[in-house]
Curated annotation (Swiss-Prot):
Gene Ontology biological process terms, A to Z: autophagosome assembly; bone morphogenesis; innate immune response; mitophagy; negative regulation of interferon-beta production; negative regulation of macrophage cytokine production; piecemeal microautophagy of the nucleus; programmed necrotic cell death
Protein name, UniProt field: Autophagy-related protein 9A
Compositionally skewed regions (Basic and acidic residues) per UniProt: 724-736
Any one of the GO CC terms: recycling endosome
Length: 839
């Protein structure tokens, strides 16, 4: 049986994100000239602390926040102990009389201190309760651990504080008003002065992101490839998603940083996991470790459950009293945050996208209120409100009514009932357009299953979107159930996937010079992980197992290039971005738009625009979203997609961050007529955009540009997927330990590169290499990205990345027997399957 070598290898120089000639560079600095920040060993932790200090708005805010977290834990434990052991509830509930005077017949007013037990009685009751003593001892040990960790972190963050002041020259008072891009630019400049990393002369933006997001990128890839057990089919409820903070913590503990994890340190995978010869033994070892951690979770379940209940009660009781409808609000689920996250996307960037999509997402979910539920809510509000009105009127007439037993309780419950019922009654003046709302949501969240488009009005789409955008009450309930469910998921669902996880980390881990071991998906290389239906046809050599799903590679690459305009992408990424820009220019030229504005004003445009803020970039998105249904007669669905694609392309083509009254000067003027990427790249060095306000404006326009690109790329993907719907469908099978090969692809040859369908209004297709427009447009991208000479597909030799790796994914009609290479015997009884991925 043919077998392949899956030996982990060092990343090639063209993939290392290093300047030529610096791949094995070791910078030497004289002893007397070393700065305090020369050769920082753990750059992952250092850059993460730099980022955290920026996000927490400086050292003082971070210090006070950490102190309050310690105080919160003490308060919850102490207050709960006091309520259990030091309160006489018979007096509090008036079941026992209290006499303060010498005359028992005189009426006595009970005060709150009367219900408190004396200190001696309270102490005796605590000592008699063995369970309470055990819980207090465990809580005390945990609090002391947090206190020691707090002191250590303060010492470390004081060093980061000094780094901001002396190396980056950013005072703490100005830090809350500095964007992360400004801080990152100063870090890149500081590398040249202090040699923070001695393995590279210069740091890039991608290096910093890789250091901060090393483990997060692995988690995003694991969710993208459906390797983590997060979806379950429940009897009577159908498919459900369960992903909580406790479950995520256990995943990270097992895989990344816990004792016996897969990583030797923050930046290096253990050597045995880089070789395929012991994969079965390593999988068994991982399975046993998951079992023991699951058992530990089961034993600690009572304590964790008590803590979860108490913390949720103290956190949400006041909110529920003040705003009863708060639990009816929605939030982005933890699974949704991981599914929607780009590779190399920091937490504040993700949060900004999701915040922009929150209002349209809420309005979309409100479109599906049940008519029966609305009818019941209206009548329930009527009956409860009538009784409440009578009680309030009686109270106004005579306040002694409140002294009647349970009157105040009844008033409170009736008020909560009325508030809850009103939350299920839709606004009678609101007009809902589910398809338009879903398109607005897509513009911000960037990811969406293909079958949602055109089916926004269906309950199935609503239910699937609810997995990403869940009720706050459901979120709290899942967190409360997490201590019980997490051990079951670890023992019975995660353990059977141990072999697939081992294969995943071996096949998709690469070593980057000056960075260490990273997830290969985080390199955003369309050649190795691109999807042919996401504009990568002819530019990717990835098998179905190697390609990222839902266009994650392509959209992540576009997002990172727009967010970091100074980044120089690799050759293949530059070719992809150039091809996308060329397609945008062609589709934009095909759209006939009115002079003086993108789209005319109309009622639907105004209603869609009301979903957004008043800023100009978001209004541009509203124009594009409303355009396809506001102008012209109804068209068939395929022609509507072409028209919509042309409109988005026109918006991108004319997109410019300059306000109408500003006059561009110099080099910026010549680039503003191109895509937004070029415009912002040129303007980032211009005096027009200097200052903090200009940085925020550029960030807003970058977000809008990415939203337009997401709409455009999804439309292209939809049309290309319709052309070949079954070619790139993949599924995950159980790990094959027998080494059997995949189905033979014998007769199928290499696929020819396919061109992306053009707009329906585009008259004809000129050959790409000879088109003068292509040459001119690509010249701008050459100046922007360091350039290539040919805008077409980059010629390359056949790569070992075209092989189909382990893990059980198989491409329809294809075999796994490509480029057979024998594996030398290692004396191991583990047998490798013939589908491998060599990095």
């Amino acid at each position: 049986m043919a077998q392949f070598d899956t030996e982990y290898q060092r990343l090639e120089a063209s993939y290392s994100d290093s300047p030529p000639g610096e791949e094995d560079l070791l910078v030497h600095v004289a002893e007397g000239s070393k700065s305090p920040w020369h050769h920082i060993e753990n750059l992952d932790l250092f850059f993460s602390r730099v980022y955290n200090l920026h996000q927490k708005n400086g050292f003082t805010c971070m210090l006070i926040g950490e102190i309050f977290e310690l105080m919160q834990f003490l308060f919850v434990v102490a207050f709960t102990t006091f309520l259990v052991s030091c309160v006489d509830y018979d007096i509090l509930f008036a079941n026992k009389m209290v006499n303060h005077s010498l005359h028992p017949t005189e009426p006595v007013k009970v005060t709150l201190p009367d219900a408190f037990l004396p200190a001696q009685v309270c102490s005796a009751r605590i000592q008699e309760n063995g369970s309470l003593i055990t819980i207090l001892v465990i809580a005390g040990v945990f609090w002391i651990h947090r206190l020691i960790k707090f002191i250590y972190n303060i010492c470390c963050y004081w060093e980061i504080h000094s780094f901001y002041l002396h190396a980056l020259r950013i005072p703490m008072s100005a830090l809350p008003y500095c964007t992360w891009q400004e801080v990152q630019a100063r870090i890149v400049q500081t590398q040249k002065e202090h040699q923070i990393c001695i393995h590279k002369r210069e740091l890039t933006e991608l290096d910093i992101y890789h250091r901060i997001l090393r483990f997060q990128n692995y988690m995003v890839a694991l969710v993208n490839k459906s390797l983590l057990p997060l979806r379950f089919r429940l009897p009577g409820l159908g498919e459900a998603v369960f992903f909580t903070r406790g479950l995520k913590y256990n995943f990270e503990l097992i895989l990344f940083w816990g004792p016996g994890s897969l990583f030797l340190n923050e930046w290096s995978l253990k050597a045995e996991y880089k070789r395929g010869g012991q994969r079965l033994e390593l999988a068994q070892r991982l399975s046993n470790r998951i079992l023991w951690i699951g058992i530990a979770n089961f034993l600690l379940c009572p304590l964790i459950l008590i803590w979860q209940i108490l913390y949720a009660f103290f956190s949400y009781a006041e909110v529920l009293k003040r705003e009863p409808g708060a639990l009816g609000a929605r939030c982005w689920s933890l699974y949704g945050r991981c599914y929607l996250r780009h590779f190399n996307e920091l937490e504040h960037e993700l949060q900004s996208r999701l915040n922009r999509g929150y209002k349209p997402a809420s309005k979309y979910m409100n479109c599906f209120l049940s008519p029966l539920l609305t009818l019941l809510a209206k009548n329930g509000a009527f009956f409860a409100g009538s009784i409440l009105a009578v009680l309030i009127a009686l109270t106004i007439y005579d306040e002694d009514v409140l002294a009647v037993e349970h009157v105040l309780t009844t008033v409170t419950l009736l008020g909560v009932t009325v508030t809850v019922c009103r939350s299920f009654i839709p606004d009678q003046h609101m007009v809902f357009c589910p398809e338009q709302l879903l398109r607005v949501i897509l513009a911000h969240i960037h990811y969406m299953p293909d079958h949602w488009q055109g089916n926004a009005h269906r309950s199935q789409t609503r239910d699937e979107f609810a997995q990403l955008f869940q009720y706050k009450a459901v979120f709290i309930l899942e967190e409360l159930l997490s201590p019980i469910v997490t051990p079951l998921i670890l023992i019975f669902c995660l353990r059977p996937r141990a072999l697939e996880i081992i294969d995943f980390f071996r096949n998709f881990t690469v070593e980057v010079v000056g960075v260490g071991d990273t997830c290969s998906f985080a390199q955003m290389d369309v050649r190795q992980h691109g999807h042919p239906q996401w504009l990568s046809a002819g530019q990717t050599e990835a098998s179905v197992y190697q390609q990222a799903e839902d266009g994650k590679t392509e959209l992540s690459l576009m997002h990172f290039a727009i967010t970091n305009p100074g980044w120089q992408p690799p050759r293949e990424s530059t070719a992809f971005l150039g091809f996308l820009k060329e397609q945008v220019q062609r589709d934009g030229a095909a759209a006939s738009l009115a002079q003086g504005g993108l789209l005319p004003e109309n009622a639907l445009f105004t209603s869609i625009q009301s979903l957004q803020s008043e800023s100009e970039p978001l209004s541009l998105i509203a124009n594009v979203v409303a355009g396809s249904s506001c102008r012209g007669p109804p068209l068939p669905r395929d022609l509507q997609g072409s028209r919509h694609r042309a409109e988005v392309a026109s918006a991108l083509r004319s997109f410019s961050p300059l306000q109408p009254g500003q006059a561009p000067t110099g080099r910026a003027h010549s680039t503003m007529t191109g895509s937004g990427v070029d415009a912002r790249t040129a303007s980032s060095g211009s005096s027009v955009w200097e200052g903090q306000l200009q940085s925020l404006v550029l960030s807003e326009y970058a977000s809008t540009e990415m939203s337009l690109h997401a709409l455009y790329m999804h439309q292209l993907h939809k049309q290309q997927a319709q052309a070949e719907p079954e070619r790139h469908v993949w599924h995950r099978r159980e790990s094959d330990e027998s080494g059997e090969s995949a189905p033979d692809e014998g007769g199928e040859g290499a696929r020819a590169p396919q061109s992306i369908p053009r707009s329906a209004s585009y008259p004809c297709a000129a050959p790409r290499p000879g088109a003068p427009e292509t040459t001119a447009l690509h010249g701008g991208f050459q100046r922007r990205y360091g350039g290539i000479t040919d805008p077409g597909t980059v010629p390359r030799v056949p790569s070992h990345f075209s092989r189909l790796p382990l893990g059980g994914w198989a491409e329809d009609g294809q075999s796994a027997s490509r480029h057979p290479e024998p594996v030398p015997e290692e004396g191991s009884e583990d047998e490798l399957p013939p589908q491998v991925h060599k990095v």
